[in-house]
Regions:
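Non-cleavable N-terminal signal-anchor transmembrane helices
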Residues: 1-5, 133-135, 139, 143, ...
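Generic hydrophobic, helix-prone segments enriched in Leu/Val/Ile
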Residues: 1-2, 27, 120, 148-155
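C-terminal, charged low-complexity interaction regions
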Residues: 146-195
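Residues that form generic nucleotide/phosphate-binding pockets
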Residues: 26, 30, 44, 183
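Glycine- and acidic-residue-rich phosphate-binding/metal-coordinating active-site segment common to enzymes
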Residues: 61-141
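Short cysteine-rich loop/turn motifs with clustered Cys
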Residues: 42-64, 88
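N-terminal accessory alpha/beta regions
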Residues: 1-36
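Short Cys/His-rich Zn2+-coordinating modules
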Residues: 31-44, 66-73
Length: 195
């Protein structure tokens, strides 16, 4: 199911009693540092990363929890499990604290279901230095779901996924070059491009 996380409004007080500083302090000094709480909740949330991989990029090792809704802008959700996502250091560093703007918020890795959608486009380009891969959000999606297209573009841009995927793909291509050369001879260029 889809949650409209981008509809949440920024705020500085929680129930008119706790300030954003109070909520940030609860997270920083209790949730992360008190061993009993850390072992029970923080470590459990970290274990939700499938195979230990970051659910944002699918490449890096999940090593920290990130607030999908920034705790400094949305303090009510500072210790809400739905708001805490295990991520790699690169994705955590790339995302800054920002207000979620409807129709252009990045994807929430657990609540925005896109696995069944063919949204990622990969293109192999031959250059002087070799074959490089470029990734983008499929233009076909823009025709069928403009909002999802914009959110996916924001997601790719925010987390620098084109670069991350290009590096990963180039590494994979280089490591498997003998295999691809063999397939090129067997199938020909036209059939190989269809993959």
């Amino acid at each position: 199911s889809r949650h409209n996380w981008s509809a949440f409004q920024p705020h500085t007080m929680v129930n008119k009693t706790l300030s954003k500083e109070d909520m940030c302090d609860i997270y920083d000094s209790k949730f992360v540092k008190v061993e009993r709480i850390k072992n029970k909740y923080y470590d459990h949330l970290m274990s939700l990363a499938n195979t230990g991989k970051c659910p944002i990029c699918g490449i890096g090792q999940a090593s920290t929890l990130d607030h999908y809704l920034a705790k400094t802008i949305y303090p009510t959700y500072a210790v809400t499990p739905y708001n805490l996502v295990p991520v790699c250091k690169d994705c955590n560093f790339a995302k800054s604290d920002s207000i979620m703007i409807p129709d252009s918020a990045p994807l929430h890795p657990y609540y925005d279901e896109v696995d069944s959608i063919n949204w990622l486009k990969a293109q192999l380009i031959e250059r002087d230095e070799g074959i490089v891969a470029e990734f983008s959000v499929s233009q076909d999606l823009q025709k069928s779901d403009v909002c999802l297209y914009q959110r996916l573009k924001r997601h790719m841009d925010l987390y620098h996924l084109n670069k991350a995927y290009a590096i990963q793909a180039t590494t994979e291509l280089a490591e498997n070059l003998p295999f691809w050369k063999k397939k090129y001879k067997e199938w020909g260029e036209k059939n190989l491009r269809r993959i």
